[in-house]
Amino acid sequence: MYAQVPRATKDIDIILVVEALSAEFVAKFWEFVKKGNYEQRNKGVNENVEPKHEYFRFMKPANSAFPYQVELFSRSLGLMNFPEEARITPIPVDEDLSSLSAILMDEDYYCFTIDHSLQENGVHIANIESLICLKSKAFLDLSQRKAKGESVDSKHIAKHKKDVFRLAAMLTPASRYELPDTLKTDVSDFCDAIMQDLPNADFIKSAGLGNVTSLQIIEQLKKSML
């Protein structure tokens, strides 16, 4: 185990797992939105999957104590019924959803993340192995979109790659996980994609990953998950 150097972050990914949504929750969440006085309130539907997925995005709160952006995803339509005063507009077609949240709409990723999480006081905290899978998939998705000419910040791609290495450095020889075929393929594709552009020794040192190389980390990742 390595004493990794803490890395500052400006956002936190929180996944709300609600299998049976109540009107009380919707009312409470709407109170949260009003107190934050969110300027941008959008809604969208993913028409490319069955059943169709619904998502909401709230951004730019007037109250700086509130999160800058909140996204809600539902794998069923019509579960989130906000009052008419909400004034929710369609998500602009040129805007995209956060990678990790969108990935969780996939059944295999959703179930694996829930199954591979710690539960403290009723809150699921994703384990190392599920975070590695999510970050690997996000890296692949963003890389593919950039290759198609879409506007994708290379810094986001690099961040996901480095996050995988930070996480994989915590795997031990005893770490063994059985992944669904979908996730196993994605992790394998990630490993193949980064072999020609492994993080250098400066990154390993600055991240506090100890006396180890990027190649050793990726080899352990393969042994643990493939």
Model-predicted segments: where are they?
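Compositionally biased terminal segments of proteins
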Residues: 1-226
